[in-house]
UniProtKB/Swiss-Prot annotation:
Residues with the Asymmetric dimethylarginine modification: 479
Biased segments, Basic residues type: 248-260
Gene: Rcor2
SANT domain mapped to chain residues: 130-181, 327-378
Composition-biased stretches (Low complexity): 460-482
Coiled-coil boundaries: 283-314
Family (UniProt): Belongs to the CoREST family.
Protein known as: REST corepressor 2
UniProt keyword list: Coiled coil, Isopeptide bond, Methylation, Nucleus, Phosphoprotein, Repeat, Repressor, Transcription, Transcription regulation, Ubl conjugation
SUPFAM superfamilies according to UniProt: Homeodomain-like
Compartments where found: Nucleus
Cross-link Glycyl lysine isopeptide (Lys-Gly) (interchain with G-Cter in SUMO2) placement: 88
Phylogenetic placement of the source organism: Eukaryota, Metazoa, Chordata, Craniata, Vertebrata
GO-annotated cellular components: chromatin; histone deacetylase complex; nucleus; transcription regulator complex
Region annotation Disordered: where it falls in the sequence: 1-43, 185-265, 387-523
């Protein structure tokens, strides 16, 4: 066997095939590829020696210690344990998610860090802030702008969103990419119109080519097919495929019969918009001006509302009159009595309004005053004047006898009759009738308030003074003490004067044993 490879010496390391072929033992003729091999001899050299051979280490058996010393590439996030039940784990995850904003992976990682101790994990959740994985509207807008500038270079996108990690950016990109295929109706319509224009241009070009190739068409022949159909039929296969693609491209729009919400289409508007691009721009400018004017109106209305709101916050306290913090008192002073009579003259039996006018009297106290001082201040005539102003005609009182016979009696007359019956004393009690009082003063006109009778001054000491007539205790039968004089009685002789046909106000009643003074001037 001829020696092709010799043992290398210290100075020689490479043996070429050309030297082996020129050896005296190789008597084979040269093949046709010898010339090509000689040209590329540097590519076919055999490299022998330690410089060109790999050093193979000794075989070591596999052992667990071999992998224990290696650095772990990942981090263990969660490892289940039997000491934590599923219900307790779900409760812990829900609390971490709702209260601290952790997701499931972060909450389980915290629990694993504390060796499945739920209490320690819950206490330590507030000490860390989880990475936000939620995308706000601002983040989405920034991502779209950054993607428009930099494309899929997420390192540059992260420079515009420094609080987002690259995995989060990639994850949001694929979810955002799915929504890009959803185009609006207006965009689809624009694409359709653009496709139609391109198709018309191409048809015109093909029609011109067909006319040049075929010569002038015969316009008098009605059986000749139109020229645009021939280039379409004569187009090769790829052209027909393109037509089919454009035909079925907008197939989903066939099912949509109505425009989207808020868009109203009319033939006039479409004709005006599609007529010329300048007209469409003018229409948009007009709409923009209307929008700007509406925004100005909204801004002015907001300013007006804010000023009114500030005025309402002040309240009506500055407009209220100053009110003194008076306490309710059951005693009636002379000024309060006169004020009550004037209030009755103006408000009638509206005791609530009268109590508000006086200020320190309740509704019950005003009613008691009306019943108690009806005779003293001639409140019936005051009410008649008030009713005359309300109705426009005076109402004369009805006698008690007619009321007993069945005639309609006003409420004031019935109340007066009841008061006389309640305050009357049994006839078995002896009493002395004093002489008749002096004639009453002439009646006053209805336009002026009635004269006010001043109560007589007490002659006895304050402790021995008798109570005024017509108090609330009149509804009970008075018990006469053995050494106490009888109470003052109302003279019943006035009942006969009611039968007289003389119209006009009646004189005030007199009290037995009371000294009358000349009336005070009218208010």
């Amino acid at each position: 066997m001829p020696s092709v490879m010799e043992k290398p010496s210290a100075g020689s390391g490479i043996l070429s095939r050309s030297r082996a072929k020129t050896a005296p033992n190789g008597g084979q003729p040269h093949s046709e590829d010898d010339s090509s091999e000689e040209e590329h001899s540097h590519d076919s050299m055999i490299r022998v020696g330690t410089n060109y051979q790999a050093v193979i280490p000794e075989c070591k058996p596999e052992s667990p210690a071999r992998y224990s010393n290696k650095e772990l590439k990942g981090m263990l996030v969660w490892s289940p344990n039997h000491c934590v039940s599923d219900a307790k784990l779900d409760k812990y995850i829900a609390m971490a998610k709702e209260k601290h904003g952790y997701n499931i992976e972060q909450a389980l990682g915290m629990l694993l860090w504390h060796k499945h101790d739920v209490e320690k994990s819950l206490a330590d959740l507030a000490n860390f802030t989880p990475f936000p994985d939620e995308w706000t509207v601002e983040d989405k807008v920034l991502f779209e702008q950054a993607f428009g500038f930099h494309g899929k270079c997420f390192q540059r996108i992260q420079q515009m969103l420094p609080d987002k990690l690259i995995p989060s950016l990639v994850k949001y990109y694929y979810s955002w990419k799915k929504t890009r295929s959803r185009t609006s109706v207006m965009d689809r319509q624009a694409r359709r119109l653009g496709g139609r224009k391109d198709k018309e241009d191409s048809d015109e070009l093909e029609e011109g080519r067909g006319a040049v190739s075929e010569g002038e068409p015969d316009t008098g022949d009605p059986k000749r097919e139109p020229l645009p159909s021939r280039p379409l039929n004569a187009r090769p296969g790829p052209g027909k495929k393109e037509i089919q693609v454009s035909q079925y491209r907008h197939h989903p729009l066939r099912t949509r019969r109505r425009p989207p919400k808020g868009m109203y289409l009319s033939p006039e508007g479409l004709t005006a918009v599609s007529g010329s691009p300048d007209l469409a721009n003018l229409t948009l400018r007009g709409l923009d001006s209307q929008l700007i004017s509406l925004k100005r109106q909204v801004q002015s209305m907001k300013q007006t509302n804010s000023s009114l709101r500030q005025a309402l916050e002040g309240g009506i306290d500055p407009l209220r009159p100053p009110e003194a913090n008076t306490k309710f008192n059951s005693r009636w002073t002379t000024d309060e009595q006169l004020l009550a009579v004037q209030a009755i003259r103006r408000y009638g039996k509206d005791f609530g309004a009268i109590a508000e006018v006086i200020g320190n009297k309740t509704l019950t106290q005003v009613k008691t005053f009306f019943v108690s001082y009806r005779r003293r201040f001639n409140l019936e005539e005051v009410l008649q004047e008030w009713e005359a102003e309300q109705d426009g005609a005076p109402t004369a009182p009805v006698p008690v006898e007619e009321a007993r016979r069945g005639a309609p009696v006003p409420a004031t007359a019935l109340e007066e009759d009841d008061e006389v019956q309640i305050t009357s004393v049994s006839t078995s009690v002896p009493r002395s009738v004093p002489p008749a009082p002096p004639p009453p003063p002439p009646p006053t006109s209805l336009s002026q308030p009635p004269p006010l009778l001043r109560p007589p001054l007490p002659t006895a000491p304050t402790l021995l003074r008798q109570p005024p007539p017509l108090q609330q205790g009149r509804f009970l039968q008075p018990r006469l003490a053995p050494n106490q004089p009888p109470p003052p009685l109302i003279r019943p002789a006035l009942a006969a004067s009611r039968h007289s046909a003389r119209p006009g106000p009646q004189p005030p009643p007199t009290l037995v044993g009371a000294q009358l003074e000349p009336p005070a001037p009218s208010l």
